[in-house]
């Protein structure tokens, strides 16, 4: 659809990272956009760099698998204000592939009836992730004649 927009493919944001796993996963209740709570386990953290800027994110896990919600510094402008989601892939050697080119907007970006986990504060980045899905175009104001 014309309404979905993506940043150009960015090979530098397709990462393979070492995750510092927590000795015992902590369950945290993640608030959702509809006021519910969904439980996730805090699985581990990883460090990475974007254009030389250090950053760190937490990977969460539930019965559906691994989950990486994040908010970058473009949120509310080029990227969706409530953040984007990613499913990190565990590799055979125990590292994880984190490909920000696959970052997507939560369903609640398109329909407020969906219940979407709200990105925890620990996954709010002070730098831009120019990869993956951009803001949903339908939310933009139409151009003025």
For each predicted feature, which ranges?
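A short, structured loop/turn motif at beta-sheet edges
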Residues: 89-96
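Short acidic/polar inter-strand loop motif in beta-rich domains
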Residues: 105-107
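Short beta-strand-plus-loop segments that form exposed binding edges in beta-rich domains
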Residues: 102
């Amino acid at each position: 659809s014309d309404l979905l927009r993506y940043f150009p493919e960015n090979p530098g944001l397709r990462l393979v990272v070492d995750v510092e796993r927590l000795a015992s996963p902590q369950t945290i209740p993640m608030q959702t956009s509809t006021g519910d709570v969904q439980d996730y386990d805090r699985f581990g953290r990883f460090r990475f760099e974007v254009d030389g800027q250090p950053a760190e994110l937490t990977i969460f896990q539930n019965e559906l698998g691994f989950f990486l919600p994040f908010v970058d510094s473009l949120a509310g402008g080029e990227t969706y204000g409530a953040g984007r989601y990613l499913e990190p892939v565990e590799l055979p050697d125990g590292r994880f592939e984190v490909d920000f080119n696959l970052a997507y907007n939560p369903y609640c970006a398109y329909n407020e009836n969906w219940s979407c986990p709200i990105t925890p504060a620990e996954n709010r980045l002070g730098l831009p992730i120019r990869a993956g899905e951009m803001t949903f175009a339908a939310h933009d104001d139409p151009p003025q004649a």
